[in-house]
Structures are given as structure tokens and as C-alpha cells.
Amino acid sequence: TSIVPGDKLDITVAAKGGGSENKSKFVMLNPSDSIVDWVVNTVPSMGAGWCPPGLLGVGIGGTPEKAMLLAKQSLMDPIDMHELLERGPSNHLEELRIELYQKVNGLGIGAQGLGGLTTVLDVKAQDYPTHAANKPVAVIPNCSATRHVHFTLDGSGPAVFEPPDLKEWPDIEFELGEEVKRVNMDSLSSAEIQSWKSGDTLLLSGKML
């Protein structure tokens, strides 16, 4: 929370999953140590529990708790890596972001840890002055479900959010094939469950919970 002069509340909310939060990492490096090397060596140790592809937030400097806060705050920034790659870096933080983006994707971890070219969609970074003897570094991942909302309250009434247009999502067409078993969850029986075999393709309908 930052208190500034004015008569409005500017609010950013992130509904963050526990899987990615559990993979948060912190280290106190020596001043001569490489931030890039530490992050690249650390990401594989996170496994797939943070649900890649997602974002990495990197916080550098300050105190240990400040570095963690910087990493979390950086995840609130919009995804703009493609724009950054097109125009090129203009400062050391943008250079760091690009290098980490390329090297982490080069690890080949991929979606859900199953291998692939894309492990991170973007890398965010913020820094802060720190003691010359220290280099606190934090990295916090954000999963592929990046649920953010930003709104302003000015006293005129509650915030109103328009639901997204379903036309923004592409239509998915695929062939079901003859071997698909249609399962109605509303009338599912134990005998039907016992008839399933490993490798069966199930097409579910009805209420699951």
C-alpha cells in the first residue's frame, strides 16, 4: 500500500494460486555473483508445480524482505516481452529481463514441465539500492492463469466490471472419433466407472462438483 495525496483508491488485485507461490525463492548472493546464473539454476528446481508457462518476477536489492516485495510487485506489470524484443533494451533491467527470458526458455521445461520451447511468457524485474556487501535476490513465479484486475474507486459508487466477450476466444473444432465414450456425470454409475480402461477417451458432460 502506498499513500499519496489525492481522493481516489487505485487498486490492483491478483488472484494468485498456491502452487506458484510455493515455488518462491530467495538467496543472498555475494556482490560478484551472477543473478542470471542463480535464476537459471534455480528454475529447474521449481519443478512443474508453478504451472508453466507463466511469468517470473525478480526482485534485486534492498533487504531480504524488500527483494521479495519487489519480485511480487513486478508481477503486476503487463506482459510486454514481445514489444521489448522488437524495440530492444534501454536500461540494465531490460537487458536482464531479455537474457533471463531467453535462457530460461532455453532450458526446455515447457508447458506443465512436459518439455517445449516456452517456459516463461515474460520475465519482470525491479531493483533497489542495497548495502555494498549484499546482493539479495528473490524470484517469484506466476502460473499460466494470470488473474489480474485493476480498478479505481473515487467515491462515486462501486467498481463495475464488464464480462469479457466470448468471441475473443477461438472456436475449437476436433474430431471425437468412434472410440470416445460419452459420460454424463449426472447419471454416472459405479458399473460404468469400472468399465473404463486405461487409454480410454472420455467426453464428460453434466456437473462435476
Language model features with spans:
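Non-transmembrane, aqueous-exposed alpha-helical and coiled segments at domain scale
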Residues: 1, 6-58, 63-174
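Pocket-edge structural micro-motifs
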Residues: 15, 185, 206
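A generic local structural motif
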Residues: 43, 189-190
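A glycine- and small/hydrophobic-rich beta-loop-beta segment
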Residues: 171-175, 190-192, 208
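Short, structured beta-strand/loop micro-motifs enriched in basic residues and often containing a Trp
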Residues: 178-188
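Short, well-ordered loop/turn sites that connect or cap secondary structure elements
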Residues: 193-196, 202
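Short, charged beta-turn/beta-strand-edge "cap" motif at the junction between a beta-strand
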Residues: 201, 207-209
